[in-house]
A protein has these predicted regions:
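Positively charged n-region of N-terminal signal peptides that target proteins for export
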Residues: 1-4
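Cleavable N-terminal signal peptides
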Residues: 7-8, 18
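Generic detector of short alpha-helix boundary/capping microenvironments
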Residues: 8-9, 109
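N-terminal signal peptide c-region/cleavage motif recognized by signal peptidases
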Residues: 13-17
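Mature soluble binding/inhibitory domains
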Residues: 21-259
Length: 259
């Protein structure tokens, strides 16, 4: 893996794309095709590179090890993120023997392109003359439980509002209470005594969650969609879009830490 990592490092050093993947959707996850259970791809996303590990089968129907080093190329007109790069086949010593890295062999067998939205992707790759095209989604085997009390910042931009003064970006320090189940989410935000209630469904897609529903605040009601809900022991982050009876377009981000 050291030589693979060296190849990856050379891509990073000379890549023209120098942003951190915090500015894009984090694609790190286990990806699969639900109707083809038995194979899959693990994506590890660092900065502008997605390292892909394939668990697939060779012509002898035995497990075969491939890796792909896909660097960011562009964003498609439909919003998809496009990553592409070389694909390698590796072989090495049997696990029952002391590992000798000098026995590892690496051969480039083709290229791979990973075109991803938040929770779905297309995968195109070739192994020598064999070309494969697959549709993928993040694989979910457990759902996060967001239930708890939090404090943080809610940043929202409103547009198309009936009152011009409401067309603005506002950053609010909020207290947040969330109740979450496998299929439902309720969230209450408290900004200096101004209470807003969000009630909707909940869907887990790999490490990402999402929710759609309705919200009500003093003088405002509407619909919302929360995307890229990520949770860890410290807190929760996510993106939100929606509309209300006052503004036709709302977008923003939520970042909250556990109390």
């Amino acid at each position: 893996m050291k030589r693979i990592a060296a190849c990856l490092l050379s891509l990073c050093l000379f890549s023209p794309f120098a942003f951190a993947n915090t500015f894009t959707t984090d694609l790190t996850d286990l990806w699969w095709n639900e109707s083809e259970s038995g194979w899959g791809v693990t994506a590890t996303h660092q900065r502008e590179v997605v390292f892909l590990t394939f668990f697939v089968y060779g012509v002898d129907s035995r497990a075969t090890f491939y890796t792909g080093q896909a660097s960011y190329v562009s964003q498609a007109s439909n919003g998809a993120l496009i990553f592409s790069g070389p694909m390698y086949e590796t072989a090495g010593p049997w696990i029952g023997l002391p590992f000798n890295p000098n026995l590892v062999t690496i051969r480039q067998v083709g290229t791979v392109t990973f075109t991803a939205f938040v929770d779905s992707a297309t995968l195109t790759y070739n192994v020598d003359s064999t070309v494969v095209n697959k549709s993928l989604t993040r694989q979910t085997f457990r759902s996060n439980d967001l239930t708890g009390g939090y404090a943080g910042v809610f940043r929202q931009t409103s547009a198309g509002c009936s009152t011009p003064a409401s067309n603005a970006t506002v950053e609010s320090v909020v207290g947040v209470a969330i109740t979450n189940s496998l299929t439902a989410l309720t969230m209450t935000t408290n900004e200096s005594g101004t209470i807003c209630d969000y009630v909707g469904n909940y869907r887990q897609s790999g490490r990402m969650g999402s929710s759609t529903g309705t919200f009500s605040c003093p003088g405002r009601t509407g619909t919302y969609e929360m995307l890229e809900i990520e949770a860890n022991p410290s807190g929760v982050t996510g993106r939100i879009t929606g509309r209300s009876n006052v503004c036709s377009q709302i977008s923003g981000r939520l970042a909250i830490v556990k109390r």
